[in-house]
Swiss-Prot record:
Gene3D superfamilies: 2.30.30.140, Leucine-rich Repeat Variant. Belongs to the PDS5 family. The gene is PDS5A. Residues 1425-1442, 1464-1476 have a biased composition (Basic residues). GO terms for biological process: cell division; DNA recombination; DNA repair; homologous recombination; microsporogenesis; mitotic sister chromatid cohesion. A motif (Nuclear localization signal 1) lies at residues 1226-1233. This is Sister chromatid cohesion protein PDS5 homolog A. The modification Phosphothreonine is found at T1588. It is found in: Nucleus. A motif (Nuclear localization signal 2) lies at residues 1426-1433.
Amino acid sequence: MAQKPEEQLKELGSKLDLAPVSKDSLLKLLKEAAVCLSELEQSPPPAVLKSIQPFLDAVIKPEILNHQDKDVKLLVASCVSEITRITAPEAPYSDNIMKDIFQLIVSAFAGLNDVSGPSFGRRVLILETVAKYRSCVVMLDLECDDLVKEVFTTFLDVARDDHPEIVFSSMQNIMIVLLEESEDVQEHLLLILLSKLGRNRSDVRDAARRLAMKVIEHCAPKVESDIKQFLISSMSGDSRFSSSQIDYHEVIYDLYRCAPQALSGVAPYLTGELLADKLETRLKVVGLVGELFSLPGRVISEEFDSIFLEFLKRLTDRVVEVRMAILDHIKDCLLSDPLRAEASQIISALCDRLLDYDENIRKQVVAVICDVSVSALTSIPVDTMKLVAERLRDKAILVKTYTMERLTELFRVYCLRCADGKVDTGDFNWIPGKILRCLYDKDFRSDTIEYILCSSLFPSDFSVRDKVKHWIQIFSGFDKVETKAFEKILEQRQRIQQEMQRYLSIKQTQQTADAPEIQKKILFGFRVMSRAFSDPPKTEQNFLILDQLKDANIWKILTNLLDPNTSITQASRIRDDMLKILSEKHSLYDFLSTLSIKCSYLLFSKEYVKEILAEVSVRKSSKNTLGIQPCMDFLGLLACFCPSLFDGAEEELISFLKDDDEMMKEGTLKILAKAGGTIRENLIVLASSVDLLLERICVEGNRKQAKYAVHALASITKDDGLKSLSVLYKRLVDMLEDKRYQPAVLQCLGCIAQIAMPVYETRESEVVEFIRSKILKLKSETVDDKKLSWDDKSEICQLKIYGIKTLVKSYLPFKDAQLRAGVDDLLGILKNILSFGEVSEDLESSSVDKAHLRLAAAKAVLRLSRHWDDKIPIEIFHLTLKTPEIPFPTAKKIFLGKVHQYVKDRVLEMKYACSFLFDITGSNVLESEEDKHNLADIIQHSYQTKVRKISAQTDANSVTLYPHHILPYLVHALAHHSCPDVEKCKDVKEYEMIYRQLYLIISMLLHKEEDGKTEDIDKEREYVPTIILIFHSIKQSEDVTDATKSKNSHAICELGLSIINHLTQKEPDLQGEITPVSLPPTLYKPSEKVEGDKSQVGEEKLWLADETVLLHFRALKLESHADASVIPQTSENEVMIDGESDGNEIPLGKIVERLRAQGTKTRKGKKNKSVPAEDENGKNDVDVLKMVREINLDHLQMLDKFESSNGHKHSPSERAEICQRDQKGNKRNVGDATSVVSVPKRRRSSSGHSPYKFSNSGPKVQLKASEDELHLESDMDKNVSLDSHDENSDQEKMLESISPRKRKKSLSSKLKITESDWALTDVERSRSAGGGDSKLKSASGSMKKRKNVSGLAKCSTKENKLVNDELIGCRIEVWWPMDKRFYEGTVKSYDSTKQRHVILYEDGDVEVLNLKKEQWELIDTGGKTAKKSRTSKGNSKKKRSSGSKPKNPDGVQRDEDPVTTTPKGKRTPKKNLKQLHPKDTPKSLSLEHEKVESRNKKRRSSALPKTEYSGEAGEEKSESEGKSLKEGEDDEEVVNKEEDLQEAKTESSGDAEGKEAEHDDSDTEGKQENNEMEREAEENAETSDNETLGAWKSKVGKSISRTAI
């Protein structure tokens, strides 16, 4: 019988007590003991404990417990661990012994890293025992902190991925128990755990990292506060953890996965790091946060929502590297869960970055969105994908080509999903249309587009049937532009196929024909085909090389590719074979690759036609009538350009022709009309009665069917339909009396006249007589006109319109139109209809019928003018122009739409565009925005085609070379039909409408861009003289049709010349004698000079040219293409309010004109009235000259400030003294503050917009004014005269000397000051200005301005020539006056036509500047020759922001007066203040100051004392956040601006956009008069049209309180 374990242990204890000498005997005893101990249960009876007590005592003997052999130590550890298990919960030994035991047990754990070792199993048992029975808690009771630390360190060091799960869980449980049972988490334990966290660490195993995360996850409530404290301390730079070498970013990542609640207080610190100035910090935290949000299955907590939002805002970071990193993480974020809750926010942020200024960012955004869309087609909204597609128009070829590739890939994926039956895959059939639009892009052209359509658009294994289904949907979604591009591609392919077939045919017969003649034909064919390639000259050379090839296989393959019977599969295979024959190294490889696509039927083949016809039948049988129309339309288009594809489809076409479905029948007729000549033989074989079927449709079908049936009948017969049409024609004429078929019969008669004129002429007289007497002279029933609408025309009216169309078609045959006679009779009919609305004045009909007939007659004139323009009398031309006067808006829209269409298609002379000017509604001309756009489009189109016209003209002085050639026709029409007799009628109001019409057309001719700006000064110099010459030529001519109207024409020309002077704000500079241009001889002839009259013909002064009359016209509210100008007869306050209503500013010129208009109106009533010195209500007239002078003085004061800031004028003591005087002055006038005028804010550009809105009205702020400012203001205020005559005289002088100049391409207000003025010191100016107190109040908008003042000093010609394209790539410094400092940037490009440089600043801002008018310095030429700017060499850069307090070098303000600042929002285009550096400023100071301020580049938000946002008080943002937001948003608007510059060549000026303005409301009291200073300011200051509304309001506010007249 075996001994019991306790008995064995008793014996073993006795043996151990004797201390065995050998190691082996000791190991044997310990092994036996371990086995016995494992067999005992926990908490055995006392007898058992007593029995094993000898062993318990023996095993802890020092010589055993402290044995040095590792095997002995392991067995001892195994035994004592079992002993602790058995005696639990009581400790088997004393505290000191237990410490030694746990030290032994912990040392045993160190061997767990050897999984394959013989002792691994025993160590695992020890680990399990300790974990299961929680004996490790005793270590805490014994305060074995070092031992506990060793446990943590050991476990994390020995953890392996190949450990059994029991080992991992046991270690995890032990560590959790030690943490949970401890009163406080020891810092070193936490650091041990955190030190193992982090991604991609080579020094830490994944198992250890996973173990640490599991422990933290289970102990999160216990360790949360300590972790939070550690992280906050580490992120705030606490030196206590600086030596821990723990990367808290990596810790945060793992904590977010295992214990996100521990990060609750970390969010603000992460947000702060996202806004840090240091790039490395931002990049690191971006990487962390990006990976956190990319974790799959994670929902962003509320705590991290603020971090997420700021993370998205980093997409606007000024550093490209940061933005690129965020895009990568956003991509991972969306791919992990495309439908996550934050997807819409992410996508919205991505859309904004599609307009980033960096092309690599834009490309990456496209990549991100397309990658996400490919993974889940419905994850990205269609509207977002269409925004991505707009990058096909990107200015960078890198972006547009990449976008093309990704959209093509996306469409392929979409096709595959559709083929798999996944119906919920979104709609991407619009993508091919966007690709087709790129046909007009010079970087793509047809070569790229055709390759994509043929080879890349659909999956390679896609069946023809699937392709057909998609093509039908694609085609049905095309808009006009896409349809036109698609037709263009098909047309080019047809031309190349025809020319290649002709070339191959000639090549086969070359041996038998005349070689030179053949060569000539071949070269001509090559030239024709080359035009369809992207590089025609190179292509033509490649054709010549191809012609020399002797390889018969190449020619055989090309012949097969041109065969329409070759299937798509065969064509693709033989094309590949041809390219293999050549190999990629061959010079013709790329050329033949493109040619084989263009001349083959890879795009559409006969297989397509058969599948489409089958699809029609399927939809017909399924009663899907809506799906039939796009199929028939698609077939009709293929029939136009690929008629050979319908060979073999005759049977289906005949069945469709016989079908009752009208859409199928009409579509088939169109196909037969286009492709009938190709398939006529097969048609006759299949159905000999097809011509009879077509004849029946001609009579019984509707008008459209009848039209196609006639053309089909002519197409399918061999003699061009002469025989068939003769029979049909006879039958139709005989049926004219049958009212049932009259519409179709008239249609057929017109078509026959166009196709077969000999047939039509056989009975033409009968047809014409019938239409004239039996149709056009029909009387309509009397109807109440008041109840009729445009659609209520009578059947008789409709029949008359059909008759007119038939007569018109008879004079527009397809061949030999000029051989027709008798068009005068038709024109006579049209004249009567245009005049009376009927063919005879005696005929009565409703106003609706007359309107319809007038419209039909006008459209007929437009069509006839293509061939008969020289036969159309001037009177009919005038009547046609007046068609928009029809009192039905629909009639105007239809007619003007036709004019626009015909002129754009080059089938109508531009002179008919005059009709737009006769669209008069009330007192407005061309009120419809659509019609305005169309007229502008016509003018733009005419400018674009002018070069081609010039090359075709022989008369260089011909006015028809220019778009302006419509002016003679317009003047003639106005003189005859709108203008009263100028010698009899002296009522100015009768000429107001003529002035409006002229103003509109001239402004559009001069300002031909959509925003009303002339492209550049050079072009204005070309256009203005041309228009002036036209008017002068008319004045020197005589009316051909009615000499009595000549005076009217001359008077209208006077108005036109005054409008030009008004728009250009300068007298025309016509060098030499005026050379008349060639005017239309049908309108004007040179005037005969009377003998003895020495005056030049046509130069006599007419009363309409009188200045007072012109002032009346200029006071009108005029609508032009550029702007809405002067508001008539309104008070000053109304003028200002109206100017603010649209958020724009009113330029100086316009306000002066308004004041002039008021003056002419009110002067009469005020002559005899005495006026008080001041009018507090501000209802009197304003001294305009006074205001102009004050504005000029404001500029002078700004220059004084600028000089002072340069250190030129005042010492610190002097500046302090002036500052004190200013403060005193301000304090005295505090109680006199008046209301502050709100200024409309200005967007950066017309296309961009800011998501951040600021209040329009800023708070009231007191500004300090320098003494010289106050004195200068005093001078001007003192100069007001109380005499009404004197004041009127002053106003008149001002109006003559100050002309508000319309800016053409400048954002700056310009002020010219002589060098002597610049040299004046502040003290001298103060002395000359005199004394007095002044009050200066100012309110700023929400953002500061950058003012531009040019001409501060004369520059040499040599200096002017230094700015050119050689600066590209150089680094320069550009002066920002309102910031009082330079900013560094790189010159990226130069537009020589506009003399504009594109500057990329270091912070990412982009600005387009004319450096010749800027203050700048060259820093680094990049190896190029250094050039200087217009500035002086000794310029100082030591400057401070205007309005801010002076600071010491340490940044402490000198003045303790507390002020608040207006926060800067998004940087807008500022007015450029161009300032010369004073020569005597030490440059070292400026460089030192530059270094100090380089850290604060973005702190340029206020050039005025600080104020708070109204409505947003207390809102604070960190500096970095403000920087990134502003710059990121600027990036978007810069790209919009650059794309507009490239595609539309437009640039905003201050007249078209609203700008932020600074208010200067100053009121002066008791100032002394100083005429000398006033004259100096008046002579050297030039007011600008870019003066803002705010500044003008302030001046008005100062002046209206004083007496005027």
